[in-house]
Amino acid sequence: MEIEFSGEILHWHGPSPFHFIVVPAAECATLKEEWSFASYGWGMIPVTAHIGDTAYTTSLFPKDGGYRVPVKDVVRDAEELDDGDVVPVLLRLRLPK
């Protein structure tokens, strides 16, 4: 199962700062309808994310009725990405073993 979209890299400046991309509403509807069976604790959904030439494992986390894709520092460094960049994202569902 795959979902593709483009999104902006945002920087959250909280007590534990991190970068993420907001999943668009239409794709969130698909996630809720078709991928929720794979959810674990607090609605997290395990995925392999592809940004540019970099693939990494992470989990989508629910926020404000939608989902966020965490973007690891190693991914941002490898792809030379900055806050505000709009990038194509491919998500593949990771099924529990």
Model-identified regions with their sequence ranges:
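Long, compositionally biased stretches
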Residues: 1-64, 85-97
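Short, structured beta-strand/loop micro-motifs enriched in basic residues and often containing a Trp
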Residues: 65-73
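Short alpha-helix capping/helix-loop boundary micro-motifs
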Residues: 35, 72-77
